[in-house]
């Protein structure tokens, strides 16, 4: 370790910034946030610094650098674009035993400013010892994605209750377990939900019940359509905090690979032909049992849990059984598959509305408004429609949708094996059969679907019926 990490209390202490440009602006703003009394010296100041000086936010020294500027300074930052000036600042600071940072010049610096993840009062600092600043920045971005912004509130709450926690849990082992519960349990969840009052109530109740059993919770997470890059930061955090993950059949391996390594993974996806209601009842029972055992449960569903995912039913069940829960939205298939196929779901010239429809219904239970669906100037996105293409096509044509209306079938949308098959509504069932389209696939119907022929940027694209050579193959 070539650098000793240290956090400096600069409140009310004089810090000199030499330089008046954009870099000096950034350094000055960071120092002011830390409570420093900042003095900026330069021949000219950036408008932002000039405004701060006029408002009394900083002190100003005009002209070129002079060693006398260092009088009374605890730290100095050299932020000019002239290395000779920066070297002079560094030498003068060294002679006076004042720590000096020369921006982007480790050789001239006696201290370095790290990349920072700020969840005050919790602060994470990352340094590459000046060797690879880009690497430090990348690491900071990764850490930023892992820690919710409510973490600072949680740290402040823990600090405020520290004496009471110590009194209520005098045994060190008990106290550690309590802090684990505090960081991972319902208090942290309430803060993430912007409910600080309820968070404090949870903490008060726990302190009044010294030996209370750990209380589990369920996070309903939308996994998106398959590309792990489309997972939200909150979803990633939930996967990294999970004790057990109950995942659906369409959740991709790439998404599961991002989960905590020691989390238990249980597939609960429904298979074609089985009793889906019975399977759903088993999922409900499993969520309840795991949460009551004090575990952090992630219910991981493809796409978004509230778009044809029975997420509402699962939340109703959890609420009825007094299980704490959260919901993390996911990118639903209609949005992601269309985007990866180059299809804008709305377009000023072609579609002023979008309708998301489930095609997973039997003819004797069909309550869809087919007359409304058959109107033009709208985009239809049919979920779970591969097995119902003949029925969907017949109903739309019967209610007046034009036979020449474009369609796009997006198979395995957003995944490496994505394939887009396009054509016209009249030929939809035949094209799908001849092209051997298989689930999972999203069906898009409307004028915008034709844009896939020119705008698709990802995966394979096949238009219309296969030619004789393809059929022979």
From Swiss-Prot:
Modification sites for Phosphoserine: 128
Uroporphyrinogen-III C-methyltransferase: region residues: 216-473
Keywords from the UniProt entry: Cobalamin biosynthesis, Lyase, Methyltransferase, Multifunctional enzyme, NAD, Oxidoreductase, Phosphoprotein, Porphyrin biosynthesis, S-adenosyl-L-methionine, Transferase
Active-site residue list: 248, 270
One Pfam family hit: CysG_dimeriser
SUPFAM superfamilies, per database record: NAD(P)-binding Rossmann-fold domains, Siroheme synthase middle domains-like, Tetrapyrrole methylase
Keyword Nucleus set for record: no
Region (Precorrin-2 dehydrogenase /sirohydrochlorin ferrochelatase): 1-203
Taxonomy, superkingdom: Bacteria
One Gene Ontology biological process: methylation
Catalytic activity: uroporphyrinogen III + 2 S-adenosyl-L-methionine = precorrin-2 + 2 S-adenosyl-L-homocysteine + H(+); precorrin-2 + NAD(+) = sirohydrochlorin + NADH + 2 H(+); siroheme + 2 H(+) = sirohydrochlorin + Fe(2+)
Keyword Methyltransferase: yes
Gene Ontology MF terms: NAD binding; precorrin-2 dehydrogenase activity; sirohydrochlorin ferrochelatase activity; uroporphyrin-III C-methyltransferase activity
Chain positions recorded as S-adenosyl-L-methionine binding sites: 225, 302-304, 307, 332-333, 384, 413
Binding-site residues, NAD(+): 22-23, 43-44
InterPro entries in the record: 4pyrrol_Mease, 4pyrrol_Methylase_sf, 4pyrrole_Mease_sub1, 4pyrrole_Mease_sub2, CobA/CysG_C, NAD(P)-bd_dom_sf, Siro_Cobalamin_biosynth, Sirohaem_synt_dimer_dom_sf
EC number, UniProt record: 2.1.1.107, 1.3.1.76, 4.99.1.4
Pathway linked to the protein: Cofactor biosynthesis; adenosylcobalamin biosynthesis; precorrin-2 from uroporphyrinogen III: step 1/1; Cofactor biosynthesis; adenosylcobalamin biosynthesis; sirohydrochlorin from precorrin-2: step 1/1; Porphyrin-containing compound metabolism; siroheme biosynthesis; precorrin-2 from uroporphyrinogen III: step 1/1; Porphyrin-containing compound metabolism; siroheme biosynthesis; siroheme from sirohydrochlorin: step 1/1
HAMAP family registered for this protein in UniProt: Siroheme_synth
NCBIfam families: cobA_cysG_Cterm (TIGR01469), cysG_Nterm (TIGR01470), PRK06136.1 (NF004790), PRK10637.1 (NF007922)
Functional note: Then it catalyzes the NAD-dependent ring dehydrogenation of precorrin-2 to yield sirohydrochlorin. Finally, it catalyzes the ferrochelation of sirohydrochlorin to yield siroheme.
Family classification: In the N-terminal section; belongs to the precorrin-2 dehydrogenase / sirohydrochlorin ferrochelatase family.
Entry protein name: Siroheme synthase
Gene that encodes the chain: cysG
